[in-house]
Amino acid sequence: MTLRSLYLQHFRNYEEAYLEFSPQFNLICGPNAKGKTTLLEAIHCLMIGRSFRTSHYPDLIQQQFESFFLEAQFYKHGIEQTLKFGFHTTDRKIIYNSTPLATLSNLLGLIPGVIITPDDVQLVKGSPQLRRQFLDIQIAQVDPLYVHHLNRYGRALKQRNHLLKMKQQISIDSWEQEMTHSAAYLIQQRYQTITHLQNLAQKYYHLLSGENDLLTLEYRSIANSNLSIDEIKKLLVKQLCKNRQREMQIGYTLSGPHKDDLFVAIGGRDIRYFASEGQQRSCVNALHFAEWNRLHQRGDGDFPLFMIDDIGMSLDSNRKDRLVEQLQSVGQVFLTTTDPKFLDHIDADKKIFTLPFYN
């Protein structure tokens, strides 16, 4: 797919802006705090319905205004399409071509893509929640049923935790039944995704770092990867029953996909403790390239967008050159940087946007 244009109104520091993009490289450059990241943020909102910096829509509204509006024109499978996204006070509206979309789940996959940000090193250094989110976002873009089960599991988990805190066992069985049904699907899909990502991530890690160390991914869950959905469900039911009395005392659920983790290692050693920052960032980049590749394969051959905020941050010149080399084969690319000459040596169709340009 190709993002042809983007229109912003009262979004962050943009009163109004209209941009037409190159089908290959788009370099957004300028001093810090001038709105470079905001442009990627707007595209990300159109991709998955929220910013990668906040989940609170009012934060995205320009000061002294009550709403923001985004509109994208894009080509998908050769057909020009339009996506509009607006928020006013408490009301969110999404319109795809001329059809209103009732939920964010209907938005997912319309504009597939990945983004790498400076904070993404926390993907390998930070909490398990970030790694679960990494898996959830990419699976949700290609599997609507996953979104259904993710929402269903979250609702049932919230209700079960409430009953645990209230020490009410009367209706807890029905919520556990709903939980385990959806949890089994989530766990199985995460295992399948990681199996697919493993070889891709290893390949990209070598290409991006030049190192031959083995990058390994391991999903850590109560259930094993070789179990069927029914077997996972039975195992979860057994575990919930086993833990119920203890969970009544502490007021929350101890096991399930909301507690699982993705373990990442280089050369068999935990990347959190035994890798340099350069290795960690190359690993994160490799995971996102693998994510892009999977979205491409699962998306009927469409090329997802690839965005990098503050490209080259904390990378040495070798890793930076290797990163740019790989970007030349991923379709449409959006990069932010303070260096307007960053792509001077690239022989490709490119467009440079120099900020500020909105005054």
From Swiss-Prot:
Pfam families: SMC_N (PF02463). It is found in: Cytoplasm. InterPro entries: DNA-binding_RecF, DNA-binding_RecF_CS, P-loop_NTPase, RecF/RecN/SMC_N, RecF_2. GO terms for molecular function: ATP binding; single-stranded DNA binding. ATP binds at residues 30-37. Keywords: ATP-binding, Cytoplasm, DNA damage, DNA repair, DNA replication, DNA-binding, Nucleotide-binding, SOS response. GO terms for cellular component: cytoplasm. SUPFAM superfamilies: P-loop containing nucleoside triphosphate hydrolases (SSF52540). PROSITE patterns: RECF_1. It comes from the Bacteria. Gene3D superfamilies: P-loop containing nucleotide triphosphate hydrolases, RecF/RecN/SMC, N-terminal domain. One of its GO terms (biological process) is DNA replication. Belongs to the RecF family. The RecF protein is involved in DNA metabolism; it is required for DNA replication and normal SOS inducibility. RecF binds preferentially to single-stranded, linear DNA. It also seems to bind ATP. This is DNA replication and repair protein RecF. It comes from Protochlamydia amoebophila (strain UWE25). The lineage of its organism: Bacteria, Pseudomonadati, Chlamydiota, Chlamydiia, Parachlamydiales.
